[in-house]
Amino acid sequence: MATINQLVRKSRSSKVVKSNVPALEACPQKRGVCTRVYTTTPKKPNSALRKVCRVRLTNGFEVSSYIGGEGHNLQEHSVILIRGGRVKDLPGVRYHTVRGALDCSGVKDRKQGRSKYGVKKPKA
């Protein structure tokens, strides 16, 4: 425990909290342009072809973003919106593509959990 005199000379330093999503710069989402759309394999023990795209953001950052849902219409030069949220089994992928915003379409024939995949309520 520090004495009062020690605290007067040098106050306590607060912990620096490091962001998990530095490219967003404290914004909820950021717009960017796809520079490459590709599939990659997850780390052990999972096995799949995960859809990922490399995105050049409006602030100059270049990041990898995961494309969730079944099927997508993204290609090079598509303008997309990204949000934070990492993919646990893909190293280096710390962002998600927002479905149903800008050039990224919603998931086709999606009935449940629609809001996460940019799908409007189907006509009854």
Swiss-Prot record:
Segments forming a coiled coil:
none
- What is a single cellular component term in the Gene Ontology annotation? small ribosomal subunit
Q: Which UniProt keywords apply?
A: Methylation, Ribonucleoprotein, Ribosomal protein, RNA-binding, rRNA-binding, tRNA-binding
Task: State if rRNA-binding is listed as a keyword.
Answer: yes
According to the UniProt entry, its GO molecular function terms are: rRNA binding; structural constituent of ribosome; tRNA binding
CDD domains the UniProt entry points to: Ribosomal_S12 (cd03368)
Matching Pfam families:
Ribosom_S12_S23 (PF00164)
Q: Self-association or partners: how does it assemble?
A: Part of the 30S ribosomal subunit. Contacts proteins S8 and S17. May interact with IF1 in the 30S initiation complex.
Record's function text: With S4 and S5 plays an important role in translational accuracy. Interacts with and stabilizes bases of the 16S rRNA that are involved in tRNA selection in the A site and with the mRNA backbone. Located at the interface of the 30S and 50S subunits, it traverses the body of the 30S subunit contacting proteins on the other side and probably holding the rRNA structure together. The combined cluster of proteins S8, S12 and S17 appears to hold together the shoulder and platform of the 30S subunit.
Q: Please report the name of this protein according to its UniProt entry.
A: Small ribosomal subunit protein uS12
What organism does the UniProt record list as the source?
A: Proteus mirabilis (strain HI4320)
Print the organism lineage.
Bacteria, Pseudomonadati, Pseudomonadota, Gammaproteobacteria, Enterobacterales
